[in-house]
């Protein structure tokens, strides 16, 4: 579990757009598990799941219809897709909402559905771009706890982009970004020590000159 920490406009969403090929670049190269994104995008992208900052669920479809559509994009057989969908919905405590229209769900529930959707094809890496933005504290904590648990249970690598420092726990790895550049990276204790501050909040404020 690694936190990509930066203010709004720091470049977090741009980085995710480059990784997912929403943006193309003529310079540099991105590799995912050794696979070149430009030369072999299918192999590179098949191992990642993404939860974008902007909601991407179809509000007029049911939860199941949304997830079945996503599974079809990955070429999954219907029987396997149904099994995985039920499993992921059960893990996030929303199995009973399977046939419910997405429009009727709360913001926190929709976010959890998007996380479930991102895991159906069993990725090795999960990218989340400000997944708790606009949610109440209870929903934020539920989502954060679930994703951190996925790291342990599924051995899943997670890159969690946020501007909320209180989502970082001691011992976690952090990459601090500002204006498209990496200012610091390492575990919380190391970053605090190198910047001669009392905590990660002070270190962050010092680095981005708040």
Model-derived features: where do they sit?
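Conserved ABC ATPase signature
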Residues: 101-105
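Conserved ABC transporter NBD signature motif
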Residues: 28-39, 44
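ABC ATPase "signature
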Residues: 185-186
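Conserved ABC ATPase "signature" region
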Residues: 68, 72, 79-97
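Conserved catalytic motifs of ABC-family nucleotide-binding domains
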Residues: 122
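Catalytic Walker B motif of ABC-type/P-loop ATPase nucleotide-binding domains
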Residues: 126-129
